[in-house]
Amino acid sequence: MIVKSAYRKVSGSYTLFGVAAVIDPAGYRAGVAIIIFNRQKKLFWAKRVRQNAWQFPQGGVNEGETLKQTMFRELKEETGLDPEDVRIVTVSKQWLYYRLPKHLIRHRSEPLCIGQKQKWFLLKFIGNETKFNFNLSEKPEFDDWQWVSYWHPMKEVIVFKKQVYHRALKAFASYVFRHRSEKIEHGQEPPPPPSLSA
């Protein structure tokens, strides 16, 4: 799926770090989000630079990019990983949306961006942990990382992303914990998803 420049006719694009970013007619920036899991069914969880805020890698689609190209570009820029370090397990069937809080919306921007719509990629990590490197971008997103239990991100993600994280994790759980016998034998079955009010 290529995000075409036709978007510009109905909505528009704006320049972010010198690159045209795609915004749909409703004001949502098109992007990808990435969940990486390892052999122990733990998830890659990264800390934003100089903040006590943790999240999954994510980023916006540049005009003319496919979603897969965007995902691999963001993967490299934000984590240092290459395509051979991961295997694509699945991609969300639908766009998952989140709206920005009012104080984060740049009301003077044209076109107006009110949030993000994301395709979520589930990747299995098959590389070496020494490949993780946050210094490949001029403006690194992260400065620390850890492997965490499956639902752990729901405890720490910023409140306005909580619902979209919940939907993605719920949709991907059956891919991470594929076989019932494996779940029981290794004690790796995730607990039921936490409620969004928690």
Language model region names:
Residues 36-39, 48, 123-125:
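Active-site beta-strand termini and strand-to-loop segments that position acidic
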Residues 61-159:
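Unchanged
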Residues 50-52:
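A conserved beta-turn-beta hairpin within the catalytic core of GNAT-like acetyltransferases
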Residues 32, 60-61:
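Gly/Ser/Thr-rich helix-start
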Residues 55-59:
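A short gly/proline-enriched turn/hairpin at secondary-structure junctions
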Residues 2-39, 110-111:
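Acidic, metal-coordinating catalytic segment for phosphate/diphosphate chemistry
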Residues 154-198:
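Charged phosphate-binding loop/patch that engages nucleotide di/tri-phosphates or the phosphate backbone
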